[in-house]
Each structure stands twice: as structure tokens, then as C-alpha cells.
């Protein structure tokens, strides 16, 4: 998926 500013989403 896309990496969020707070937490990396896989």
C-alpha cells in the first residue's frame, strides 16, 4: 500500500 506520514502501511 502507501506509506503514511505517521506509520508505514504495507
UniProtKB/Swiss-Prot annotation:
**Protein localization:** Secreted; Target cell membrane
BP GO terms, sorted: killing of cells of another organism
**Could you tell me one molecular function GO term of this UniProt entry?**
toxin activity
Q: In which tissues is it expressed?
A: Expressed by the venom gland.
Q: Which UniProt keywords apply?
A: Cardiotoxin, Cytolysis, Membrane, Secreted, Target cell membrane, Target membrane, Toxin
Any one GO CC term of the record: other organism cell membrane
Main location class: secreted
Q: List all disulphide bridges recorded for this chain.
A: none
The record's subunit annotation is: Monomer in solution; Homodimer and oligomer in the presence of negatively charged lipids forming a pore with a size ranging between 20 and 30 Angstroms.
User: Family per UniProt?
Assistant: Belongs to the three-finger toxin family. Short-chain subfamily. Type IA cytotoxin sub-subfamily.
* Function as written in the Swiss-Prot or TrEMBL entry: Shows cytotoxic activity against Ehrlich ascites carcinoma (EAC) model in mice. Also shows effect on apoptotic features such as nuclear fragmentation, caspase activity, pro- and anti-apoptotic protein levels on treated EAC cells. Increased levels of antioxidant enzymes and cytokine levels observed in toxin-treated EAC mice. Cardiotoxic towards guinea pig auricle. Has no cytotoxicity towards macrophages in vivo in EAC bearing mice or in vitro in normal human lymphocytes.
Identify this protein by name: Cytotoxin NN-32
Amino acid at each position: 500500500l502507501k506509506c503514511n506520514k505517521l506509520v508505514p502501511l504495507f
